[in-house]
């Protein structure tokens, strides 16, 4: 029997745009769970599912769906921009994103992406 854990998880706390931010990434067999919070809670839970497009199978389109929280257009755009690279680098696996952040600016998004990259489990 192997000693490799069934669930792999990494976390990092860093100040992003002046706000203490916690990021936790957990790899399951079919999904990657990414939690990004500046409030100490999960906030909005968004599912990002890759779906193949006939023209380019190597870069599937990510379909977003809010599972919990406010379903606003900005959260779909923010979620795709924040974790699309996670799905691609993980072999087009689905991503569950739990996000509760104050700053949804492009600068904040780029900084959050780098913290997520540090927590790579895929």
From Swiss-Prot:
Q: Would the keyword Iron be found if you checked this record's keyword annotation?
A: no
- Name the Pfam families on file: PAC3
Signal sequence bounds? none
Q: Name one GO cellular component term.
A: protein-containing complex
Instruction: Please give one Gene Ontology molecular function term for this protein.
Output: molecular adaptor activity
What highest taxon heads this organism's lineage?
Eukaryota
One Gene Ontology biological process: chaperone-mediated protein complex assembly
Which residues carry the post-translational modification N-acetylmethionine, per the record?
1
Q: Which keywords fit this entry according to its UniProt record? A: Acetylation, Chaperone
The task this protein performs is described as:
Chaperone protein which promotes assembly of the 20S proteasome. May cooperate with PSMG1-PSMG2 heterodimers to orchestrate the correct assembly of proteasomes.
Which family does the UniProt entry place this protein in? Belongs to the PSMG3 family.
Subunit organization: Homodimer. Interacts with PSMG4. Interacts directly with alpha and beta subunits of the 20S proteasome but dissociates before the formation of half-proteasomes, probably upon recruitment of POMP.
**Under what name is this protein listed?**
Proteasome assembly chaperone 3
Its gene name is PSMG3
